Amino acid sequence: MRADNQNPSFTNVTLTKSTKSLGSKAVKLYASTAQDLMTWQQRQIRAIMSTNKNGEWKYSKYCIALSRRNGKGEVLAARELYALIYLNEKICHTAHRTTTSHDAFNRLYTLLKKAGYEEHSKKKKDMPEKSFYASKQYGLEHIEVTGGGVIDFRTRTNNGGLGEGFDLLVIDE
């Protein structure tokens, strides 16, 4: 890793000491997988997952605009990992290219394993805690955490996801 400044020039997120956020918990969970987030990534997670005084998400839409291969995917993975395990969210992770979607699936799959979750080859009603089921079919990847959330990885099409409800829509470019 390079030792010089790793902060993107776009970072203008305002977080005060009174800002409530689940982001610190997500960063801690991510760190339990032996992965580290850079300071700017941690700041983005805290902003994305900040809540208002009623405990609702502060931002219904959030965008990180960076060029390719600058660490956006790790921010998304940290958010998705926490959502699957603790928020029981139904997530749709979309990308323009199948390879991008597949890479995101592999990243999250690996993080779950590193977090101590055991994969089961078949979805069963009585799967133990800290386990998950994953469908690895290329282009139709899917992860379901026992007692937790679900995430579908897709490419964008004219009718993909129509009629379905998701708690979180991730548009990965």
Q: What is the meaning of each model-derived region?
A:
Residues 1-173:
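Phosphate/NTP-binding elements of NTP-utilizing enzymes
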